[in-house]
């Protein structure tokens, strides 16, 4: 289930001491970073939830990227163009 977090400090605490995050659950430790033209999204998979934090400020996004612990893998995903894909039959 997805869960959006709007506070930076709460998102950063998920890496440290939360029973739901991979740090204590023994799961795969991966942070997905999806960058579009305007918004950067950070996604952290927990045991129960997929935590998402998004920001439009590139300085904040760079700070969060630098703050990701070395124990986590960081996978960067480039966003698609803003044009919608058409369905072909």
Curated annotation (Swiss-Prot):
InterPro entries in the record: Ribosomal_eL38, Ribosomal_eL38_sf
GO biological process: protein-RNA complex assembly; translation
Source organism superkingdom: Eukaryota
Keyword Ribosomal protein: yes
Keywords: Ribonucleoprotein, Ribosomal protein
Gene Ontology MF terms: structural constituent of ribosome
GO CC annotations, alphabetized: cytosolic large ribosomal subunit
PANTHER family: 60S RIBOSOMAL PROTEIN L38 (PTHR10965), LARGE RIBOSOMAL SUBUNIT PROTEIN EL38 (PTHR10965:SF0)
Family: Belongs to the eukaryotic ribosomal protein eL38 family.
Protein name: Large ribosomal subunit protein eL38
Name of the encoding gene: RPL38
């Amino acid at each position: 289930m997805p869960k959006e977090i709007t506070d930076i400090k709460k998102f950063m605490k998920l890496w440290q001491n939360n029973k739901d995050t991979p740090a204590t659950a023994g799961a795969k430790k991966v942070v997905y970073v999806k960058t579009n033209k305007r918004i950067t999204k950070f996604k952290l998979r927990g045991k129960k939830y997929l935590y998402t934090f998004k920001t439009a400020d590139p300085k904040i996004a760079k700070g969060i990227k630098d703050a990701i612990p070395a124990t986590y893998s960081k996978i960067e995903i480039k966003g698609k163009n803003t044009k919608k894909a058409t369905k072909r039959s």
